[in-house]
Amino acid sequence: MTAAVWTLLLAYLFGSIPAGVLVARTYGVDIRKVGSGNIGATNVLRALGWGPALVVAFFDVFKGGIAVLVARAFGLSDWMLGGVALMAVLGHNYSVFLRFRGGKGVATSFGTLLFLDPALALWTFPIGLSVILLTRYVSAGSMTGGVAAFVLSLALGRPLWEVATVFLMALLIFWTHRENLKRLQEGTERRLGERAEAR
């Protein structure tokens, strides 16, 4: 196989590493059976607190970034960089190690964007964070961040491959948050700081 195919596969496998499951397991907890059942940092925060959640968030961000760095090391084209970024996110969302289930891809999307286009990532981050702090809904901030990244990529005149990549990542974020969106509309979505209970 070519370097491009190997890198896409590696990005998917690296994205598939379920940090939330592994960290929670060290505390004797199956994070998939607590709270929302999601393996991401937000559910880990509700179940185990800030320390474990920050470890999970850090890993989920940087596994996306490392995939991009590997692609650059192989000298892949810009469009392939976008493909690698998306494969890392898909790995997180549909992990081969979890029977193709996984997280929601927000931290991993941010990590890939941080290494693809640091300026765009750093413009997007405070927008999503502001929504989280104002509403205490992580899901609302995540979806807002996805939209903001896409709009900013257009407004700042980013190349087509990057705009397309960001657009697809935003679509994935909305897809994985479809149940959250429904709960937001119903007024039943959990807010940041609420503790998770066993399912």
From Swiss-Prot:
Query: What InterPro entries does this protein's entry cite?
Result: G3P_acylTferase_PlsY (IPR003811)
Identify a single GO molecular function assigned to this protein: acyl-phosphate glycerol-3-phosphate acyltransferase activity
Compartments, record wording: Cell inner membrane
Which pathway does the database say it acts in?
Answer: Lipid metabolism; phospholipid metabolism
Q: Which reaction does it catalyse?
A: an acyl phosphate + sn-glycerol 3-phosphate = a 1-acyl-sn-glycero-3-phosphate + phosphate
Membrane-spanning parts: 3-23, 50-70, 78-98, 113-133, 154-174
Top-rank taxon of the source lineage equals: Bacteria
Q: Name one GO biological process term.
A: phospholipid biosynthetic process
Which Pfam families does this entry report, sorted A to Z?
G3P_acyltransf (PF02660)
Q: Does the keyword Lipid biosynthesis belong to this entry?
A: yes
Look up and give the membrane topology term: Multi-pass membrane protein
First-level EC class: transferase
Key words of the record: Cell inner membrane, Cell membrane, Lipid biosynthesis, Lipid metabolism, Membrane, Phospholipid biosynthesis, Phospholipid metabolism, Transferase, Transmembrane, Transmembrane helix
Reported EC number(s) for this entry are: 2.3.1.275
Q: Which GO terms describe its cellular component?
A: plasma membrane
Q: What does this protein do?
A: Catalyzes the transfer of an acyl group from acyl-phosphate (acyl-PO(4)) to glycerol-3-phosphate (G3P) to form lysophosphatidic acid (LPA). This enzyme utilizes acyl-phosphate as fatty acyl donor, but not acyl-CoA or acyl-ACP.
Protein family (similarity comment): Belongs to the PlsY family.
Subunit and interaction comment: Probably interacts with PlsX.
Name the chain's protein.
Glycerol-3-phosphate acyltransferase
Species, as recorded: Thermus thermophilus (strain ATCC BAA-163 / DSM 7039 / HB27)
Its gene name is plsY
